[in-house]
Amino acid sequence: MSHVLVNVAWPYANGPRHIGHVAGFGVPSDVYARYERMKGNDVLMVSGTDEHGTPILVEAEKEGLTAQELANRYNRVIAKDLCDLGLSYDLFTRTTTGNHEHVVQEMFKQCLENGYIYKGTQQVAISPSTGRTLPDRYIEGECPICHAEGARGDQCDACGNELDPDELINPVSKINGETPRFEQTEHYFLDLPALAEANKAWLETRKGWRTNVINFSLGLFKEVKPRAITRDIDWGIPVPVKGWIDNPNKKLYVWFDAVIGYLSASIEWARRQGDPEKWREWWNDPACPAYYFMGKDNITFHSQIWPSEMLAYNGKGSKGGETGPMGPLNLPEQVVASEFMTMEGKKFSSSRGIVIYVKDILARYPVDAVRYYISVAGPESSDSDFTWAEFVRHNNEELASSWGNLVNRVANLINKNFGEIPPLDEDSMTNEDRGLLEEASAAFDVVGSSIETHHQKHALSEAMRVVGDINKYISATEPWKIKDDQARLGTVLHVAAQAVSDANHLLAPFLPHSAQKVWEALGGTGTFSPLPELKEVEDLDKPGFTYPIITGDYELGVNVHPWKSEAIEVGAMVPKPAPIFAKIPTEAVEEELARFDEALAARRAAEAERLAAEKAKLAAE
């Protein structure tokens, strides 16, 4: 058994998450974690809500809430949505815990002691109307490098380069359209140039990364500049330096603290297990690989920023230094970044109403239909488009008609003719029988290899190919016509049931909810595919502060079945089957498109009204 660390990008707690978000960080990470558990590996899968930074302050102000109140609201919303989606976190937590604050400050202090954090000045954008510092991504303008419009103050999506707000040409605030003013203020900086050589050398040893991810990551080192890691803001983690720690208007920058969440969540998980040092098995053992799942807009933070922080903490940059008490910390084995998903040809945008939230789609459609569509049509290595027509087609043709109907046919024939799993009569077996069993068994290596190399679309297509071949076997053997040879009928149905069971194992990482139903349809008892649960807990360091976590029991041999062909149990009672998947009426496509258009129009009207009010307010002042 090996240890495997699965780190999942932290959703920002300024609103509910939509289907484009979970297509990048959610379902792919869960498929991988479930597969590794079935392989017998000891997986630690962690994440949580990212809750600091100016965007939360801005949204809270709009709603008349404190930043903590807004974070509390969306922490609960997001945790429930991700739990309902079946994402099997060992711990899904948040960044406003006392534990996270302690770990972040420990990281900062060791990096400072090693010389990789220093004090300097930087121009920051200020809102003339409020006097508040504007977050980088709330400023837009023309990119100074590729001259694309709509570049943000932290990055240009068109060319992928990192930017500072004062580099933009004709910058404006996304909040109210005003032109920001820039002022010099004192900040702490992470000395990325002093870490660049070690960071790049590590990147050059990476193998098996998606081409777009490794090429983009290496491109970050053409020009490396120090990055400010503090902000003039009253919402965030205090800066652990004398003269700063008690300053209410100086906090650590959200991107510095958020990536440390992988480590702090692992430590919190260990503390909640009653074994406070257990996290080290995943973070300090160089043999333990760490896989990071996210959308491509987060590549920079996981192939440059977070590795640089760990190198600084480990004392492995050009300035040397001592490894801190939490180290040495393992750098990522692989950064698994998906591309972007659009919706009906348009870029997802909550503010513009181009969105389908996780909660809404799960309220109307089965969870595994959503997971299947993301897996088969998601943005694995190129941008993809969510369309309602394709969502319905994949569900109806592949899940309901092909897979679900197959399970029902086999279970119904067994129930009707035997009532239990019939024995296999070796004497009546044909080459066709043996061929199907061999194919289904061999598929574990094929599908598993594709999941291990993060080609989940190919893995799913191979699993569904097995489903297709079982359907062909049923059509060719025509068990409903075997009237006078019970031994042969039993053999055909046993072979079919065994192949269906194998296919169910292959599909379980993708379709955990229906996998349980298929298991039970073939006479299985107990848990086959464990699901996560929400639990209300109290903060380990802040008495009275409570919040929900996602956790679960995913122990191999108890709640998790192995990644191999398991012999079905002869004599296991097979009940009259119920449908595993239902077809979605084709009328749903037009209904969803109409709902989408209505929401889009309403959001546009509301946003136009809000901007007009902001401009009128500025004009009056």
Curated annotation (Swiss-Prot):
Signal sequence coordinates: none
Enzyme Commission designation: 6.1.1.10
GO biological process per UniProt: methionyl-tRNA aminoacylation
Catalytic activity: tRNA(Met) + L-methionine + ATP = L-methionyl-tRNA(Met) + AMP + diphosphate
Keyword 4Fe-4S annotated: no
Motif window: 'KMSKS' region: 347-351
Gene Ontology cellular component terms for the protein in this record: cytosol
Names of required cofactors: Zn(2+)
Gene3D superfamilies: HUPs (3.40.50.620), Isoleucyl-tRNA Synthetase, Domain 1 (1.10.730.10), Methionyl-tRNA synthetase, Zn-domain (2.20.28.20)
Keyword terms, alphabetized: Aminoacyl-tRNA synthetase, ATP-binding, Cytoplasm, Ligase, Metal-binding, Nucleotide-binding, Protein biosynthesis, Zinc
Compartments, record wording: Cytoplasm
Sites where the protein binds Zn(2+): 143, 146, 156, 159
Disulfide bridges in this chain: none
Matches recorded under SUPFAM superfamilies: Anticodon-binding domain of a subclass of class I aminoacyl-tRNA synthetases, Methionyl-tRNA synthetase (MetRS), Zn-domain, Nucleotidylyl transferase
Gene Ontology molecular-function annotations: ATP binding; metal ion binding; methionine-tRNA ligase activity
Annotated motif 'HIGH' region, positions: 11-21
Subunit structure: Monomer.
Functional note: Is required not only for elongation of protein synthesis but also for the initiation of all mRNA translation through initiator tRNA(fMet) aminoacylation.
Family that this chain belongs to: Belongs to the class-I aminoacyl-tRNA synthetase family. MetG type 1 subfamily.
This protein's name: Methionine--tRNA ligase
Lineage, top ranks: Bacteria, Bacillati, Actinomycetota, Actinomycetes, Bifidobacteriales
